[in-house]
Amino acid sequence: MTRPIQASLDLQALKQNLSIVRQAAPHARVWSVVKANAYGHGIERIWSALGATDGFALLNLEEAITLRERGWKGPILMLEGFFHAQDLEMYDQHRLTTCVHSNWQLKALQNARLKAPLDIYLKVNSGMNRLGFQPDRVLTVWQQLRAMANVGEMTLMSHFAEAEHPDGISGAMARIEQAAEGLECRRSLSNSAATLWHPEAHFDWVRPGIILYGASPSGQWRDIANTGLRPVMTLSSEIIGVQTLKAGERVGYGGRYTARDEQRIGIVAAGYADGYPRHAPTGTPVLVDGVRTMTVGTVSMDMLAVDLTPCPQAGIGTPVELWGKEIKIDDVAAAAGTVGYELMCALALRVPVVTV
């Protein structure tokens, strides 16, 4: 028998989450963001469940080609654009929409030999200060691009740094309005948080990512608990060992947990080599045989320990949900001082994945 840990992906939840995005932004088209191998879920596993989307957005050329090879004929947006001028040959071949955010890309587009014009997303820096042109340069750059034979349809895009806050986009929106002055253009501004909470930023295309997979852009499950969004990934395993501790006995590396009284603990086949966060402290929520309990002690490479006090019936082979439908990935991430995005993306290759 194989080691009992596995990740299961609920494709119906993925479809429902896309439907909820459409309800949240009924007048916009949807770029489903599948970067980082669909946030760790696997593009090849999940793309067809998102077949009702208007387009896919990602980073890697290899992932874009995978979508084309699997039969996706709709738009694909390359969120960081092309990294080298020679990439434009493949962008042309596979009909990819490219972000343009830097001066060197303008020259590369001008000089490229393309069979047909490429659609362009011109990125404005609205305060994130990662990629994009400053607002006072956008009109000039837009006009440069518009004059190029290699450029097809154009859209203005940006990315919000603080859309999870009620007033988090006001400054960015002001900079975007400055950038768009004098332009009649399509816009794509909204990430997951803005899609849910800032309808004034929806415009023509929204770009949901984390909410498609059923986690919160704020890192707090309670913020999306009433939206109908459902977790797509469940990471589960089983108890493979049971120990009964005496008062004062300790658990795991460094002995960081000490039993106050006699206590049963279960040893679960899951550790940081599987993608479970090593820094998850004692008290991180976990579900054992349908009962909510907690981890105890230090997470090891291949194992972790859980308190069996609330579930005395548990023993060898008892199922454990590490995150999923009941134990939200946001709650595990918050306990470990990180975000659900990271845990999804960190799922290890050695963990078997099934779709349901």
From Swiss-Prot:
Keyword Isomerase: yes
GO molecular function: alanine racemase activity; pyridoxal phosphate binding
Signal peptide coordinates: none
Modified residues (N6-(pyridoxal phosphate)lysine): 35
Pfam family, one: Ala_racemase_N
PROSITE patterns documented for this protein: ALANINE_RACEMASE (PS00395)
Lineage top rank: taxon: Bacteria
GO cellular component, one term: cytosol
Catalytic activity: L-alanine = D-alanine
Alphabetic keyword roster: Isomerase, Pyridoxal phosphate
One of the GO BP terms on file: D-alanine biosynthetic process
Isomerase as UniProt keyword: yes
Annotated binding of substrate, by residue: 130, 301
Cofactor (UniProt): pyridoxal 5'-phosphate
Assigned EC number: 5.1.1.1
Active site: 35 (proton acceptor), 253 (proton acceptor)
Function of the molecule: Isomerizes L-alanine to D-alanine which is then oxidized to pyruvate by DadA.
Family stated for the protein in its record: Belongs to the alanine racemase family.
Protein name: Alanine racemase, catabolic
Organism of origin: Escherichia coli O157:H7
UniProt lineage: Bacteria, Pseudomonadati, Pseudomonadota, Gammaproteobacteria, Enterobacterales
